[in-house]
Amino acid sequence: MNRTDEETVAAAEEILKQMKENAYSFESDSGKADMVTGKVLANYQWSGDAVYTLDQAEIDDYYLAYAVPEESTNIWFDGWVMLKDGIAGDAAKQQAAEAFINFMSRPDNVVRNMYYIGYTSVIAGGDSDIIYAYADWCYGAEEDAEDTIEYPVGFFFSGDNTDPDYVITAEADQVNRQLFAQYPPQDVLERAVVMQYFDQENNQRINQMWVNVRCFNLASLSWQDWAKIGAGVVVVLAAVVLFLKRDDILRRR
């Protein structure tokens, strides 16, 4: 995930160029609606956006699935950061910022936030089981459900994935749907990494790679292609010259 050497970036560029031939677009916003409407069959999404898409499609009895590459994936998170020196020396602003973080970290507000945005909670809940109860309420199977699985989430709530207190009895299809997206199992987390910050040199290399993928690359044209382009330009110029001469003759008459 974090290799930025020239050889790896070049290999990634070639793969992306091949994908481009069969890709609707390179983006992560309108893809949610495109998945729901069936315009596209696969879309690279953040987990919370994937949950939103799965939920929306399900309203129309259209069932989508969520998957993580076997090779690797990135562990991502949105974070609020409190500077160790405060906020420009303003004690009142620092207190307000800390109060906001504390407010957003209250288990009851965490549940409200999860319900609204579809993303995994920032905390496990500490002494409160309300967050686990909410996850169980969302994904726990009905009592009369026949095809169910035991889905351990102890790694998140207690740090022990064998903890019997944190196992959700879910419908079997949740192994590749919303529950999987919000609480990926340990084997997925073990092959996931946090993406590193690109320094200036690597950032420039990655940006150039994207330019090469998204834009037309003149360097990729063969001499036959250039010959065809040249012939086309000659034909167009000849047509323009003939048109102008014809127009000049008509005006003289």
Model-derived regions, located:
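Conserved C-terminal helix/tail region of periplasmic/extracytoplasmic solute-binding proteins
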Residues: S158-R253
